[in-house]
């Protein structure tokens, strides 16, 4: 009897100690799996979702959107014939008759090489034009690598070389560096050197600067340097561009309102001459009618317009140009026919 009671007491004591040990169980040590912490994984995913910066283009293209839709007027009668002699060579014949400038015949030639860098780009490109006075303008554009492009321009007057310019554009992943050297005179110690840099800060914002250095005996003080700041903000079909320097500033605004309408506003201010000009321009495209119209109005009350109409099914294009200056009470009209 005593043994039975003793064994029963021992069993109850064992169960009590079991419940106590279960209530005082120590926490298990965390096991390291060797993986990346979840916070770091989320941060890496958020970084991967950020849009990659792209090349912002060159500083020369900063205000091109607004400039391209402005009316490029001409005066008098003009006939232009474009003829392709091969897949790489094309010639242009132009006859211009007007009272404002030299009338006569112009000849142009274009050669496009076989080095393909894109569906619409091939290099080298050779351009040449001879005006009615016998002056020659020649340009060479070549893509040396996928990122480096060089341009060379020269001008001949009276069988003499009067102007040269060499430009190199290096397009990085998110920046563009441009170096330009104009009219270098190694014997006369004169010339112009320009350095331009444009950097994509965000997907919409690009900032940069331009440094221009001009030296020579005809320059006041024999040398002058100018530093300017540039910026561009683009979102959707809207682009704001600005150039700010000690001589003035240049501000432009461009918006593509629809597939048929583009609008641009431009303000140029020269602080030294205390002059400022504002221009409002627009372009209307009517693809079904094969018609394009560009018009502009500036603060000097100069109204300009150019109408271009393709005459289908013939390879002809008709251009009508008009320019009216209210301050000078003058009107200029031009009519042109382009074949080819």
UniProtKB/Swiss-Prot annotation:
Main subcellular location of this protein, as a coarse class: mitochondrion
A molecular function (GO) term: porin activity
Keywords: Ion transport, Membrane, Mitochondrion, Mitochondrion outer membrane, Porin, Protein transport, Transmembrane, Transmembrane beta strand, Transport
Compartmental location: Mitochondrion outer membrane
One annotated Gene Ontology cellular component of this protein: pore complex
A Pfam family reported for this protein in Swiss-Prot or TrEMBL: Porin_3
Region named Disordered: 1-37
Keyword Transport: yes
One GO-annotated biological process of the protein: protein targeting to mitochondrion
Tissue: Only expressed in the male germline, detected in primary spermatocytes as well as post-meiotic stages. Not detected in stem cells and spermatogonia near the tip of the testis.
Membrane topology: Multi-pass membrane protein
Organism domain of life: Eukaryota
InterPro entries: Porin_dom_sf, Porin_Euk/Tom40, Tom40
Summary of the function given for this chain in its UniProt record: Channel-forming protein essential for import of protein precursors into mitochondria.
Subunit structure: Forms part of the preprotein translocase of the outer mitochondrial membrane (TOM complex). Interacts with mitochondrial targeting sequences.
Similarity comment: Belongs to the Tom40 family.
Designated name of the protein: Mitochondrial import receptor subunit TOM40 homolog 2
Lineage of source species: Eukaryota, Metazoa, Ecdysozoa, Arthropoda, Hexapoda
């Amino acid at each position: 009897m005593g043994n039975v009671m003793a064994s029963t007491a021992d069993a109850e004591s064992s169960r009590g100690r079991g419940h106590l040990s279960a209530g005082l169980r120590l926490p298990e040590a965390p096991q390291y799996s060797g993986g990346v912490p979840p916070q770091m994984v989320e941060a890496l995913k958020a970084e991967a979702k950020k849009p990659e910066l792209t090349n912002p283009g060159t500083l020369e293209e900063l205000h091109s959107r607004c400039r391209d839709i402005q009316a490029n007027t001409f005066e008098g009668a003009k006939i232009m014939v474009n003829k392709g002699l091969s897949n790489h060579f094309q010639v242009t014949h132009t006859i211009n008759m007007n009272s404002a400038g030299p009338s006569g015949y112009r000849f142009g030639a274009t050669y496009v090489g076989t080095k393909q860098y894109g569906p619409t780009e091939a290099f080298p490109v050779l351009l040449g034009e001879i005006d009615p006075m016998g002056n020659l303008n020649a340009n060479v554009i070549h893509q040396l690598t996928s990122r480096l492009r060089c341009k060379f321009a020269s001008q001949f007057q009276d069988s003499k070389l009067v102007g040269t310019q060499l430009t190199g554009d290096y397009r990085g992943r998110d920046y563009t560096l441009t170096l330009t050297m104009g009219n270098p005179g190694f014997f006369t110690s004169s010339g112009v050197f320009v350095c331009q840099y444009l950097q994509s800060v965000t997907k919409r914002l690009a900032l940069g600067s331009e440094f221009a250095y001009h030296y020579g005996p005809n320059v006041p003080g024999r040398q002058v340097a100018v530093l300017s700041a540039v910026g561009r903000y683009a979102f959707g079909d809207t682009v704001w561009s600005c150039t700010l320097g000690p001589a003035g500033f240049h501000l432009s605004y461009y918006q593509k309102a629809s597939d048929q309408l583009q609008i641009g506003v431009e303000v140029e201010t020269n602080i030294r001459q205390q002059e400022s000009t504002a221009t409002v321009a627009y372009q209307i495209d009517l693809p079904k009618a094969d018609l394009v119209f560009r018009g502009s109005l500036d603060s000097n009350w100069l109204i300009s317009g150019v109408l271009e109409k393709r005459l289908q099914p013939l390879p002809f294009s008709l251009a009508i140009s008009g320019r009216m200056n209210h301050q000078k009470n003058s009107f200029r009209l031009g009519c042109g026919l382009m074949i080819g």
